[in-house]
Amino acid sequence: MKASMYLALAGLVLLFVVGYASESEEKEFPRELLSKIFAVDDFKGKERGCKGFGDSCTPGKNECCPNYACSSKHKWCKVYLGK
């Protein structure tokens, strides 16, 4: 019983700390997280010759950036997992 009380208290403290940390973070956190996950800088706004994740493309034209492939079903660039 005593251990479960300490565990519940620790959980509440952890929830408070995570909530406070997320409030204090900059608003750019979701964009930074996505750019790190997909290893591209889609949100920087700079011009490039290839299309990034989620951009529309034409299958077979090789318009997508490296590590991406044009989906023939959806017609947008997606992560290429290889075969």
Curated annotation (Swiss-Prot):
Residues 1-21 form the signal peptide. It comes from the Eukaryota. Keywords: Amidation, Disulfide bond, Ion channel impairing toxin, Knottin, Neurotoxin, Presynaptic neurotoxin, Secreted, Signal, Toxin, Voltage-gated sodium channel impairing toxin. Residues 22-48 form a propeptide. SUPFAM superfamilies: omega toxin-like. It holds the Pfam family Toxin_12. Disulfide bonds join 50-65, 57-70, 64-77. Its main location: secreted. The keyword Amino-acid biosynthesis does not apply. The keyword Secreted applies. The modification Leucine amide is found at residue 81. Expressed by the venom gland. It is found in: Secreted. Belongs to the neurotoxin 10 (Hwtx-1) family. 15 (Hntx-3) subfamily. Monomer. Selective antagonist of neuronal tetrodotoxin (TTX)-sensitive voltage-gated sodium channels (IC(50)=1270 nM on Nav1.1/SCN1A, 270 nM on Nav1.2/SCN2A, 491 nM on Nav1.3/SCN3A and 232 nM on Nav1.7/SCN9A). This toxin suppress Nav1.7 current amplitude without significantly altering the activation, inactivation, and repriming kinetics. Short extreme depolarizations partially activate the toxin-bound channel, indicating voltage-dependent inhibition of this toxin. This toxin increases the deactivation of the Nav1.7 current after extreme depolarizations. Negative results: has no activity on Nav1.4, Nav1.5, Nav1.8 and Nav1.9 sodium and calcium currents. This is Hainantoxin-III 4. It comes from Cyriopagopus hainanus.
